[in-house]
Amino acid sequence: MTKRKANHVINGMNAAKSQGNGAGYIEDDQLVLTAEQRQNNKKRKKNQ
């Protein structure tokens, strides 16, 4: 079996088409973050 690419890596997979453009998760924005900002970008701050 070949290893499948994760869905969040495929471009446009997170876009919410039924809610119109721009309603989905902004994927390209994540690449702009610095290393320090990435540390504070976790979902749950409580567990840090």
From Swiss-Prot:
GO cellular component: endospore-forming forespore
A Pfam entry, by short name: SspO
GO BP annotations, alphabetical order: asexual sporulation; sporulation resulting in formation of a cellular spore
Coiled-coil annotated spans: none
Record key words, sorted: Sporulation
Superkingdom assignment: Bacteria
Protein's name according to its UniProt entry: Small, acid-soluble spore protein O
Region (Disordered): 1-23
Transmembrane region(s): none
Compartmental location: Spore core
Recorded family membership: Belongs to the SspO family.
